[in-house]
Amino acid sequence: MNRRHLLLLPPLGVLAACAASPPPMPEGPGISYTYLPKLRLNVASIDIDETRPNAGPTDVGRSLQPSAAEAVQIMGRDRLAAFGTQHAARFITVRAAILRERLPGQTGLFASDPGERLSCTLTCRLEIRGANDLRLGFAEATVSRTAPSESNLAARGRTATSLLRRATFDLNTEFEFQMRRALRDWLVEGERAAPPPPGGVMRESL
């Protein structure tokens, strides 16, 4: 093999890097809500469902650290606290994805062209469950945010991480609003656990 052919071969390190690119590392402090007051619920226990919804092969959010689903679950753990003597609450990640999408009317083939974007959708639900797992109430929050995509893998990872941080911050705000709107009778505002909710609380069929 002559020198010209040798110069055309990529370094082995480059090939290895392309074969297995690690997930992008987060920039700045980790996602956390421990600095905020707890949303105290008049339930005996809270279950954080760790199921990660599958949004398909174009989901960038599943490769982040934390992933989009994990970021939603961090919010649930940090914000919620059981402060009662009966019933149970379940926090569910309904959707958590950052998808690469083509904009309408664009026909380019590469992510470098401005017709591609990242679309983040986060949805969570808190359910109150009574005897026989009967649902006594629920609150659901969702946010959707977008950002231009990048052609470079590392740059796309940084953009996705920033987008996830903004979306989870907004989800936290929306989640607390929906909690106070739909489950206000289940919130404990004082220092002690509240008595069981009054009989007038509406029950919803599954």
Spans of features found by a protein language model:
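N-terminal export leaders
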Residues: N2-L7
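N-terminal segment of the mature soluble domain
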Residues: P37-I98
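Bacterial Sec signal peptide processing site at the extreme N-terminus
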Residues: G13-Y35
